[in-house]
């Protein structure tokens, strides 16, 4: 009889533990959903602030969105970082934008777009060697993006470095071809 009571007690305990775990999981999922909604709301406010020229407000909103992130970094946080860097640049905080791109590259060392955008900023600050290295890394991690090669060439040419950009232009032609139809992208 005593053994039967112990078994029933264990069943009851396991049942309560299972219910507790399910309720906890549901609450945490609800919190995660709420955080994601808050993050999206802040992101939207940031984008709207950028569109109206309120870059400081945009930065505050993007920082608020990123503060909602706890745990795993997702594509949403990466997207918010791109917006944050754009707002920093628009607010003439090139150093802040560079730091944001540095953080993105530290997180994902193969983020070709972050390398490209950081290279563009470095080019604008006069760090041509740093820009060239970032452009090389961008194509290293996204070697089949025709438009990336063309954009690198255009950026280099805009800073009187067309000669350095010629290799990128030639690589673009090897990706897409150099007949008239291919060039009409």
Language-model segments: which ranges?
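Canonical positions in the second alpha-helix
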Residues: 65, 103-104, 137-138, 171-172
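Register position in tetratricopeptide repeats
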Residues: 51-52, 90, 124-125, 155-159
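Canonical tetratricopeptide repeat
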Residues: 76-79, 83, 117, 151, ...
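Short coil turns that delineate tetratricopeptide repeat
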Residues: 70, 109, 143, 177-178
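Helix-start (N-cap) detector for alpha-helical repeat units in TPR-like alpha-solenoids
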Residues: 39, 73-74, 78-79, 112-113, ...
